[in-house]
């Protein structure tokens, strides 16, 4: 274990997430009981520590990715909003998501026949399986999984306008925030690649990296960027205590303009609902309802 005082993101026993670009004038902090892992992979700084409230915490490049305590609020919403917005998803693509949480949730759908997961950093997968095993909960051993260790952007470029057998019903983008190499995942070209990789009636969902308390103009611009490519684009959100302002926005798109993305297209069985902590049909729809002032900006 590393002494707390030696890590650049930790001072006086407190982890500090500070970003003057995304949330100037404020910071998110939590105490560090012990550091479980700290090193730089080929792609990013990785920090894993214990907190008495949130349990094990995964931090990439100084940004909290997930904690044992509240991870389900993000994993379930980014997964099941997209999965239930499709009437019969059989082929699913996950871009990023190395902690395994989204994979765990996708694997709960018995209708799914093939899961392709593209993660550039194998270290995140290995460390998450070691220190955060409940996130994947064995899903990396699912026989439906085809795990590819490569860049998600290039993977989509290689699909291009290929035959329908290589395309997907649902694509879930669980990428890092739009800084450095990940910035490409929030631009118009990326949405074009997503559309090319979708089957008819396909659904795409991605985390926006922001929420309406922090940067309304950014969310407005991001949604409009997606709308240039997809005829059906909506914004919704989920509540996660360890994300800045306790909230994270999601962009949901479809190449079918007639699909009401805010309404589940399949009924959830009692058995399926019993496996979930956060998502339900009511919260699916309510997640698209925004406060008046935010709705005017984001959806204008």
Swiss-Prot record:
Reactions it catalyzes: S-adenosyl 3-(methylsulfanyl)propylamine + spermidine = spermine + S-methyl-5'-thioadenosine + H(+)
GO term, biological process aspect, one: pantothenate biosynthetic process
Sequence positions that bind spermidine: 177
Pathway where this protein functions: Amine and polyamine biosynthesis; spermine biosynthesis; spermine from spermidine: step 1/1
Name of one Pfam family that matches: Spermine_synth
Residues modified to Phosphoserine: 5
Annotated PABS domain residues: 12-255
Positions annotated to bind S-adenosyl 3-(methylsulfanyl)propylamine: 44, 99, 119, 151-152
Molecular function GO terms recorded: spermidine synthase activity; spermine synthase activity
EC number: 2.5.1.22
Enzyme kind, highest EC tier: transferase
InterPro entries with a match to the protein in the record: PABS, PABS_CS, SAM-dependent_MTases_sf, Spermi_synthase, Spermi_synthase_euk, Spermidine_synt_N, Spermidine_synt_N_sf
Highest taxon in the source lineage: Eukaryota
One GO CC term, this protein: cytosol
Active-site residues from the entry: 174
Keywords: Phosphoprotein, Polyamine biosynthesis, Transferase
Further information: Present with 3870 molecules/cell in log phase SD medium.
Family indicated by similarity: Belongs to the spermidine/spermine synthase family.
Protein's name according to its UniProt entry: Spermine synthase SPE4
Species of provenance: Saccharomyces cerevisiae (strain ATCC 204508 / S288c) (Baker's yeast)
Underlying gene: SPE4
């Amino acid at each position: 274990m590393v002494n707390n005082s030696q890590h650049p993101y930790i001072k006086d026993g407190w982890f500090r997430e500070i970003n003057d670009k995304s949330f100037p004038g404020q910071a998110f902090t939590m105490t560090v009981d012990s550091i479980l892992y700290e090193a730089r992979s080929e792609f990013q700084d990785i920090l894993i520590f214990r907190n008495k409230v949130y349990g094990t915490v995964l931090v990439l490049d100084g940004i909290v990715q997930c904690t044992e305590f509240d991870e389900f609020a993000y994993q379930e919403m980014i997964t099941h909003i997209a999965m239930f917005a499709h009437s019969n998803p059989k082929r699913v693509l996950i871009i990023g998501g190395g902690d395994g949480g989204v994979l765990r949730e996708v694997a709960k759908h018995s209708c799914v026949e093939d899961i392709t997961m593209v993660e550039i950093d194998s270290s995140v997968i290995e460390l998450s399986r070691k220190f955060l095993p409940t996130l994947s909960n064995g899903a990396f051993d699912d026989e439906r999984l085809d795990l590819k260790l490569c860049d998600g952007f290039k993977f989509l470029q290689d699909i291009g306008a290929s035959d329908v057998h290589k395309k997907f019903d649902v694509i879930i983008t669980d990428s890092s925030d739009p800084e450095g190499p990940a910035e490409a995942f929030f631009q118009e070209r990326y949405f074009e690649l997503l559309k090319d990789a979708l089957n008819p009636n396909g659904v795409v969902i991605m985390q926006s990296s922001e929420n309406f308390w922090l940067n309304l103009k950014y969310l407005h611009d991001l949604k409009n960027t997606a709308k240039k490519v997809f005829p059906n684009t909506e914004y919704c959100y989920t509540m996660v205590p360890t994300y800045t302002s306790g909230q994270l926005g999601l962009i949901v798109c479809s190449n079918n303009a007639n699909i009401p993305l805010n309404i589940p297209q399949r009924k959830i069985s009692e058995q399926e609902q019993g496996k979930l902590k956060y998502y339900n049909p009511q919260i699916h729809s309510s997640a698209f309802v925004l406060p008046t002032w935010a709705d005017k900006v984001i959806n204008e």
